Amino acid sequence: MATGPGGVTSHGGCTEDDDDIKVAALNALQQMDPEKAGPVLKRVLARRDTQSVCLRRKAIFLLAQQGAEGAEPTLLDAARHDPDPEVREQAVFWLSQVGTDASVAALDSILRTTKDPDLMEKAVFALSQQGSDRSIQALRAYAERSDVSEEGREKAIFWLGQTGTSENIAFLRGLYGRLRGEELKKKVLFSLAQTGSKENARWLAGVARNQQEAPELRKQALFWAEQCDLPTSEFASLYGSTADRAMREQVIFVLSQRGDKAAADKLFEIAKSDPDKELRKKALFWLGQMDDPRVAEVLQDILEH
């Protein structure tokens, strides 16, 4: 908050004594005759001067509250061209609340044209709340773009995963193979893991097995696969299918978290016969944390031989 000339309080370019009366007039007009208020609100929103910032903020709220047909072009114009960030962001938010085909088209247009990362992020969220075919297509197109921020693409990927539809799951799996950035790939792994389906868990296990994939991504895929309801045998078999020590360490950890008989059996096998002494030691450590009556016998056997 700042104090303007003559001690007048100012909020982000708004002067209270200048705007209070005008805002009150807008409110009164809206309550008295919404049809007449519409054109007035649109004229207010067409202004770009600093003196009308607070008035425009109020006008965009009132216009959205009207729910009148044809508000989308005005909201879109404000989202694209208003010099005040708050007005632009409010315009995007209210476009998401209109819920018409025209509003989805407007949000899509913002995604395709704006260079403002904050506005892009809000448009991604707004589209994610629509649930229409067109909004989903817009999010998919945005997730594939390489000329926008990774953070925005990550959010589009996240929201696509939240829908849980088979079409979006198939899209995300296909997208994974086309992505180059590790962070974006990690977001796909995370989004698919959130569905909790065995089908996606097996797909994640497949990524973990892929020796052409980056080690960190393989470990991430294994971590998320473990959160799903896959049988322990899937993870036990993964140990033998990789020669990478870091991956084997991750498999040992995953097995230790399973805590069932099959996991203990595999850890016993590793502790007894793995040629890598460090991996045997890790298996022994985790066996010591498990509540399995056979552990003491195995440890004694190792000590005696």
Per-segment meaning from a language model:
Residues 19-20, 50-54, 69, 84-86, ...:
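Alpha-helix N-cap/helix-start positions at coil->helix boundaries
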Residues 1-12, 34-47, 68-80, 100-113, ...:
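Amphipathic alpha-helical scaffolding segments comprising HEAT/armadillo-like alpha-solenoid repeats
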Residues 76, 84-90, 94-98, 108, ...:
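A generic tandem-repeat structural signature
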Residues 249-290:
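Ankyrin-repeat and related helical/solenoid repeat scaffolds used for protein-protein interactions
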Residues 236-240, 245, 250-252:
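Alpha-helical adaptor scaffolds
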Residues 1-29, 33-43, 54-55, 74, ...:
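Short linear regulatory motifs and low-complexity interaction segments
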Residues 29, 33, 63, 67, ...:
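Alpha-solenoid repeat junctions
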